[in-house]
Structures are given as C-alpha cells and as structure tokens.
Design a protein with these regions (language model features):
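Class I (Rossmann-like) S-adenosyl-L-methionine-dependent methyltransferase catalytic domain
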Residues: 1-136, 152-163, 173-237
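A conserved beta-strand element that flanks and buttresses the S-adenosyl-L-methionine
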Residues: 144
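Hydrophobic adenine-recognition pocket in adenosine-nucleotide-binding enzymes
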Residues: 148
Length: 237
C-alpha cells in the first residue's frame, strides 16, 4: 500500500463534499430505482430491506415502550422520496417527520406520501441536510437514519448523533441502518461523495457521541455484490 492509499483509508471522511453529494443526487431520478442505485422494484432489495427493518423493530418492541403522555413520533432522516416512511415506518409510528435536502426528492414525496398525508400520518418535511437539522428537544420516539450518514464526516456525524440524542423522548431510540465495509477500514466513494464505514468505526463513533448500542442485526437476503448492511439500535448512555 502506498502512503497516499494509507492516508485515503485513514481519513476517508475528509474527502466528503456536501455540494458534490447534492449535485449527484439531484441528477438521480426520483424513483425507488434511483434512490437505491439501480436496485429498484425489479430486484429483491426493496422488499428484503423492509422485511429486515420491520423484523428488527419488532424484536425491539419491549425496549421501545412509549413513555406516558407521549405519542410514537418518528423522523425519517435522509428520507429520499419517502420510500422507508411509505413502506415501513408508518406502520410503527403515529406520525412521521422527514428530513431530505434534495429538492426533486422532496417534490416526489407529494406523490409517494399522498395517502399518508391524507391520513394525518405525515408531520413536517424539512428540506435540509442532516448537518443543518436540529430536532425539537424531547420530540421523537424513533429517529431512523438509513443509507445517508455516509455523507457526514466523522466529527459531523458525532455532532449529529448528539443532537438526535437531545431530540429523543424518554425511552426514545435512534436506529442507524447503513452499509459496512467488510474490512476494518472505511471506503470513500467519489461518485456520490460518501464514505462507507466499517462496523468497528461505527461502534467507536457511537461511544464518542454518548450512545449505547442496545441491539445490532445484519440485513439478510441482499445480493452478494452489495456491501454488508447492519442495523444499530442506540439509546443515550
């Protein structure tokens, strides 16, 4: 390994550029196939993803009992076109906010989430990036972050998690569902200006943010050519 390669692996997150990421996703079709990088509804990925997430949440049911006088308010971070909210989160939450900075994706939410809006299941849509979002203190029963935190450098990710921690209800939970590298190093992808972190790095950053890992599971049934995907359930220390 050259010195340049070693530096790239050591600080993969230093190459993240928010503008490059927004430009990439703005040019991506606002469809399931687009937001999932070509693994749309003609593949097993959307179905297996929803099944895996639903199973993980059901396993956590006894550890996610809603506090007295609170509702099950969720927030979908890096929500894309609203796929996760539409297909899964609305079944677990009384109401869901969404955070998404890519304008064409936010516009597409009007289509994807139309029925849920009519049912009063959709709260506030924040058209901003994770790095600029501060949750209302004590609001959320569930903060769901899927396939998005790779756009945050390590220190920004820690700050984001700390803000999320402040946004939790009593007994609230943060869930991070993300790709992992199969090694102990992080990978930078200049296509969408994101980093894929190793499992070890995630666990380290959770500790630095003052969060305890209460459960972890690996997503099953995805194509072999994809990165491993893990779900991490977190609560404040």
């Amino acid at each position: 390994m050259t010195e340049e390669q070693a530096q790239l692996q050591e600080r993969a997150d230093s190459h993240i550029n928010y503008t490059d990421a927004i430009n990439y996703w703005t040019e991506t079709p606002p469809t399931v196939d687009g937001v999932l990088g070509g693994y749309g509804e003609d593949t097993v990925v959307p179905t297996m993803d929803v099944l895996g997430s639903s199973f993980f949440l059901r396993k956590l049911k006894s550890r996610m009992i809603v506090a007295q006088d609170h509702q099950k308010i969720g927030v979908d971070i890096g929500a894309g076109i609203g796929r996760v909210t539409r297909d899964m989160l609305h079944k677990f939450c009384d109401q869901i906010d969404l955070v998404e900075p890519v304008e064409p994706f936010v516009k597409q939410m009007d289509v994807e989430l139309h029925d849920l809006k009519e049912q009063g299941k959709i709260g506030t849509i924040y058209p901003i990036g994770m790095q600029d979002w501060t949750p209302q203190e004590g609001k959320y029963w569930l903060i769901w972050c899927q396939w998005c935190v790779g756009h945050l450098p390590d220190q920004e990710f820690i700050k984001f998690l700390q803000r999320c921690k402040n946004g939790l209800q009593p007994n609230g939970t943060i869930i991070i569902k993300e790709n992992n590298t199969p090694t102990d190093t992080d990978d930078f992808d200049d296509t969408d200006s994101s980093v894929t972190r190793c499992d070890k790095k995630f666990r380290q950053l959770f500790i630095e943010a003052g969060l305890k890992l209460i459960a972890v599971d690996r997503q099953k049934g995805l194509p072999n050519e994809l990165y491993p995907v893990r779900m991490y359930a977190l609560k404040p220390e």
